[in-house]
């Protein structure tokens, strides 16, 4: 019963209230801060729980009045309103009860790489980046290109951008994986559809507490940065390549004129990649334990197909097909993101036995 699951939260909330007013706690700033944080975390559950208890009481009261000659009809009308409210509250409470992803409020590094399909893949990498940038704009987030490598046709072989704002990771985390595109390239005279792919990685920005790197585990190379077509654009060794020896992760950065700035940027991305790798390994281990492979954010997992001739986009994880590709590419990504969030929330609720 959901009611039983809510009582400990109400008890703990009241307990914290008492503790916060005790002189022993008010003199200990560390304890006071920790308790206030805990209280603010459970407050949304407690508020909904109280509302839910009131509705349950009202339902019980009205049910007892159904046989009453004078109040029976009124009680039936009340119940018609209360029952749907109860069901809606139950769903809202279940979502609040499932464990929150600690990374949900973090900013992210978005990395898009052209895969199979050469120039066509690079052009789609550019189109996909623009779609995310438009989506970010709609959400009031800030997008900053950290590094990019252009292809001959003006697409991106690879682009890394930082996206900052409220709840960025919570909404974009399900974008990680392989995105397949089917369309007729402009250079195709026969009108044949070509299939190409890009991979997307979504890495929460991490601080030193999340990822500690031993300097001895790093191999740092400096070299001259090169421009489009390979020509050298710098006379000093400002470009930086950092290799994390234990994981084999390599980050190269040459977008800044200063070696120091390139190194700083490269280290931040390196930490994010290490963190994302660890996170992915944990998710894969959990998925094996559950004998199922959920959308784990694995880059090799094909998550979505964009079919331009049919104006169709399909998300393979939840079997969602929309004939609104144009809207999606203009940044209207919530049409896909909202059903994905709902799907994974429902999965978590089921796993939690709620």
Curated annotation (Swiss-Prot):
- Annotated region (Disordered) at 284-308
> Is the keyword Repeat assigned to this protein?
no
Alphabetical list of InterPro entries matching this protein:
PCRF, Pep_chain_release_fac_I, Pep_chain_release_fac_I_sf, Prokaryotic/Mito_RF, RF-1
Localization (cell): Cytoplasm
Question: Do the record's keywords include Cytoplasm?
Answer: yes
The GO molecular function terms of this record are:
translation release factor activity, codon specific
Annotated Gene Ontology cellular components are: cytoplasm
The biased composition feature labelled Basic and acidic residues covers 284-304
Q: Which residues carry this modification: N5-methylglutamine?
A: 231
Record's keyword terms, sorted: Cytoplasm, Methylation, Protein biosynthesis
| Record PTM text | Methylated by PrmC. Methylation increases the termination efficiency of RF1.
Which coarse location class describes where this protein primarily resides?
A: cytoplasm
Which PANTHER family does the entry mention? Answer: LD18447P
Q: What does this protein do?
A: Peptide chain release factor 1 directs the termination of translation in response to the peptide chain termination codons UAG and UAA.
**Of which family is this protein a member?**
Belongs to the prokaryotic/mitochondrial release factor family.
User: How is this protein named in the record?
Assistant: Peptide chain release factor 1
The taxonomic lineage of its organism, from the top, reads: Bacteria, Pseudomonadati, Campylobacterota, Epsilonproteobacteria, Nautiliales
User: Coding gene?
Assistant: prfA
């Amino acid at each position: 019963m959901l009611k039983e699951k809510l009582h400990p939260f109400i008890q703990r909330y009241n307990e914290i209230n008492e503790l916060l007013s005790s002189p022993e706690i008010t003199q200990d700033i560390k304890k006071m801060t920790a308790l206030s944080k805990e209280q603010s975390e459970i407050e949304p559950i407690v508020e909904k729980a109280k509302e839910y208890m009131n509705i349950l009481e009202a339902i019980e009261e009205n049910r007892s009045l159904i046989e009453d000659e004078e109040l029976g009809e009124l009680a039936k009308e009340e119940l018609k309103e209360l029952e749907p409210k109860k069901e809606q509250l139950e769903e809202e409470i279940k979502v609040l009860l499932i464990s929150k992803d600690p990374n949900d409020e973090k900013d992210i590094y978005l990395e898009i790489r052209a895969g199979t399909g050469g120039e066509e893949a690079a052009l789609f990498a550019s189109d996909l980046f623009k779609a995310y940038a438009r989506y970010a704009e709609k959400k009031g987030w800030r997008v900053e290109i950290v590094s990019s490598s252009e292809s001959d046709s003006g697409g991106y072989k690879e682009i890394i951008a930082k996206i900052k704002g409220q709840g960025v990771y919570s909404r974009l985390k399900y974008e990680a994986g392989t995105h397949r595109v089917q369309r007729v390239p402009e250079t195709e005279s026969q009108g044949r559809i070509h299939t190409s792919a890009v991979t997307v990685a979504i890495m929460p920005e991490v601080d030193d507490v999340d990822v500690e790197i031993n300097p001895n585990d790093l191999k740092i190379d400096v070299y001259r940065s090169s421009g489009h077509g390979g020509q050298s654009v710098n006379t000093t060794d400002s470009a930086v390549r950092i290799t994390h020896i234990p994981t084999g992760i390599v980050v190269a950065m040459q977008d800044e004129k200063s070696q120091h700035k390139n190194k700083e940027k490269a280290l931040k991305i390196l930490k994010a990649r290490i963190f994302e790798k660890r996170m992915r390994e944990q998710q894969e281990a959990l998925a094996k334990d559950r004998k199922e492979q959920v959308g784990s954010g694995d880059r090799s997992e094909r998550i979505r197909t964009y079919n331009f001739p049919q104006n169709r986009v399909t998300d393979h994880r939840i079997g969602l097909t929309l004939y609104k590709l144009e809207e999606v590419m203009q940044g209207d990504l919530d049409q896909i993101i909202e059903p994905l969030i709902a799907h994974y929330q429902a999965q978590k609720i089921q796993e939690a036995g709620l």
